Regions:
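A short alpha-helical cap/connector motif
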Residues: 1-127, 134-153, 159-212
Length: 212
């Protein structure tokens, strides 16, 4: 069950967003993007800090809300972010500039993730965040697990799909795919995974060392 509206508002209010993130959030809405909730952003920052992330990959740049939170948590990290929409990335680039993030710390790639991900170096990232087309989520997770280093995390935003994943009456392909993934992850020896109900849900998949 998703977090109640009262608790969700409380957690979002706790996650203090500065003017730069607020402006990026407003830009997201204007562009028709559904940004992560402030509480999810705070969780991303905490994970990035705990991981001491140096290299972060993001699938779905949006207007920069997620990227700002991740780089807040890992101020020494470099972010590589993929999106099909150049307009979105231009807004993100402007947001990063307003936050004082050097251009060298935010590499934006305009293109389809399914074309870009296979060309990236395996085991090179501390965090891979997926916040993109739900229909391609399984494909992106498969690539992400190869790209993240041992001990690193693959994060999937909007992992509860507006509560649909928990509703037995919902049987779309996207929902079925996510349910299947969650079930597979729960019994896997290669990863540890958990879903946080904060916001619209955040799935964290930690890559484990191969058994000796």
């Amino acid at each position: 069950v998703q977090t109640s509206p009262l608790i969700a508002k409380y957690l979002d209010d706790l996650a203090a967003e500065d003017e730069v993130v607020t402006a990026a959030r407003d830009a997201s809405v204007e562009l028709g993007i559904t940004p992560i909730a402030p509480a999810v952003g705070a969780q991303l920052a905490a994970i990035a800090a705990a991981t001491q992330a140096g290299a972060i990959l993001e699938v779905g740049t949006g207007a920069g809300v997620s990227g700002l939170w991740l780089l807040r948590g890992a101020p020494g990290a470099t972010l590589t972010s993929i999106d099909t929409e150049l307009d979105h990335q231009q807004h993100a680039r402007a947001a990063f500039g307003r936050a004082g993030i050097p251009v060298t710390r935010a590499r934006l790639i305009t293109g389809k993730a399914r074309d870009v991900l296979p060309r990236m170096n395996e085991a090179s990232y501390d965090i891979v965040l997926i916040d993109a087309d739900p229909a391609s989520m399984l494909e992106y997770v498969e690539h992400a697990l190869a790209l993240v280093r041992v001990g690193g995390s693959v994060l999937v935003a909007h992992a509860l799909m507006g509560g649909r994943v928990a509703d037995p009456a919902q049987r779309s392909d996207e929902v079925a795919d996510l349910r299947g993934l969650l079930k597979e992850l729960s019994t896997s020896d290669a990863v540890r995974a958990a879903v946080s109900p904060v916001g619209d849900g955040l799935l964290q998949i930690v890559r484990l060392p191969e058994p000796v």
